[in-house]
Amino acid sequence: MIRKLKFSALGVALTCTLAALSGTALAQSTIFNIPSTDVVAKKKTYFEFDFIGHLESDKNGGFQTYVPRVVFGLPKNVEVGVNVAATHSAAPAIVYVQPNIKWQFYANEKAGTAFTAGAIAYTPLKDRKTIDSFGLLYANGSKKFSGDHGARLTLGGYGVVDYDGAGANGKKATKGGVMVGYEQPLNKKVSFVADWFSGNNALGYVTPGFSFALPKNGLFNIGYSVGNRAKKNNGLFVYYGITF
């Protein structure tokens, strides 16, 4: 059981959600797990609540992770935010605070391209002597293809700083890799979306699912995360986001 970058409980719930629909006017900071090339607009706020769970009893490896997150848009295409990820399982509860920053340093709407770079810090609220603090650095780019149903493809790379955890199979964790995202509008309100972090670490998951545009700048995503390694390293992933 890994938790999103965290390591344990589905990669601390997929690293507690690093947490954009190409087919809508909405922008979100992540697809499912990987960062998108979107940033929150200046003076806007994005709020999101994630649930990630392996739907078995705790004694059989089940867990539930809850992740509220808020992101603020700043000048010069910069956003800053914070996530709080709490995981319940048979093991002691894990709570991570994750301040983060992203900079969209290039965007060409006509060409459908954008590039971003960012960083996320992961710090446990308790048990700091036994649970690692670490950081994530990344850069990525995206290409939005033309047409009413034009897909967006995102490619990038990441590195984990000061992380000494084991991989999902008990072997030494990898400290870097690639990330891939795909967003395919099906109609004006629904898109098929998927993303993947390579690596044998808390980030190493593939998550396919669907994204639904809601009224008043809302968004609902539902998918299923499957770990790159280990049995039962998977979980339902649901989130709601809104920009205001």
Over which residues does each language-model region extend?
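Solvent-exposed loop segments that connect transmembrane elements
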Residues: 166-171
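Conserved phosphate-coordination/catalytic loops
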Residues: 61, 172-173
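Cleavable N-terminal export/targeting peptides
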Residues: 1-31
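Short loop-to-alpha-helix "cap/lid" segments that border enzyme active sites
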Residues: 173-182
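Transmembrane beta-barrel domains of Gram-negative outer membranes and organellar outer membranes
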Residues: 26-153, 157-165, 183-191, 195-197, ...
